[in-house]
């Protein structure tokens, strides 16, 4: 068995043990099946939801909202963070707002976005955009501020204008911190997505979790919860691979 296979087995062994404990605990009565249905029952419910198209339809709605909000937060947040780091007047103007809103629970904005834009996609996209923009902005800001002054002075001595220095020196220097901020935003997008859909939505995975829970179909509810967890995990793994390649390319 190769070293990579062994490392994967060791890494995911806790998940396998957790799944076994879940199944055995529910089957033997150690845990109430109302509180925690057997994992095999949850898997069967997941297959039924997939056959019925519920997972596909609601999953597509959720992924569209999360993707659109995250994309906007990356584009605007990255630009805003770099501009704040590069132009002091902009930093002085916007830093108090960033510092005030960053620690605020972003789920508190759910009623506000629903009031402004209703229960459709727009309110969810706005919520995810607002919530995810701040970690991206701070990542870009911290990365741009850490630019080596020697490189900046070198570019300036070679006649590079301010915009050229920004693009050739500051943006590449900001990339590692920016990518870390985007990873934080990626995780946050799933949290905000499900939270908003639980409260103010007519479709989506969060809505489906709430609907199934209210109807007492707990095996299907857990199936959707695990689906969200799996989507978040896969998205993070894919992003890590892309992030490593980008940093390797930069080096």
Predicted segment positions?
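Glycine-rich helix-loop "coupling/hinge" segments at transmembrane-helix boundaries
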Residues: 114-116, 144, 191-228, 247-251
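Transmembrane alpha-helices
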Residues: 126, 130, 162-196, 222, ...
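Loop-to-helix entry region at the N-terminal start of transmembrane alpha-helices
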Residues: 57-65, 115-136, 174, 179, ...
């Amino acid at each position: 068995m190769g070293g990579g296979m062994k490392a994967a087995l060791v890494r995911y062994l806790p998940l396998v043990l957790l799944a076994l404990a879940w199944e055995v605990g529910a089957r033997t009565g150690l845990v109430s099946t109302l509180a925690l249905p057997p994992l095999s029952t949850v898997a069967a419910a997941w297959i039924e939801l997939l056959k019925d198209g519920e997972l596909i339809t609601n999953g597509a709605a959720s992924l569209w909202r999360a993707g659109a909000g995250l994309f906007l937060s990356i584009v605007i947040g990255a630009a805003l963070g770099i501009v704040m780091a590069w132009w002091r007047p902009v930093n002085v103007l916007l830093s108090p707002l960033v510092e005030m809103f960053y620690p605020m629970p972003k789920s508190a904005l759910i009623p506000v976005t629903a009031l402004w834009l209703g229960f459709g996609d727009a309110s969810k996209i706005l919520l995810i955009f607002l919530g995810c923009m701040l970690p991206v902005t701070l990542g870009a800001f911290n990365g741009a501020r850490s630019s080596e002054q020697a490189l900046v002075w070198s570019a300036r001595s070679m006649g590079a204008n301010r915009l050229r220095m920004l693009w050739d020196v500051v943006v590449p220097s900001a990339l590692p911190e920016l990518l870390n901020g985007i990873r934080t935003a990626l995780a946050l997008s799933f949290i905000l997505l499900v939270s908003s859909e639980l409260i103010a939505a007519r479709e989506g995975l969060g809505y489906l979790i709430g609907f199934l829970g209210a109807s007492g179909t707990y095996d299907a509810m857990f199936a959707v919860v695990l689906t969200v967890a799996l989507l978040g995990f896969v998205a993070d793994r894919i992003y890590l691979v892309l992030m490593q390649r980008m940093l390797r390319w930069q080096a």
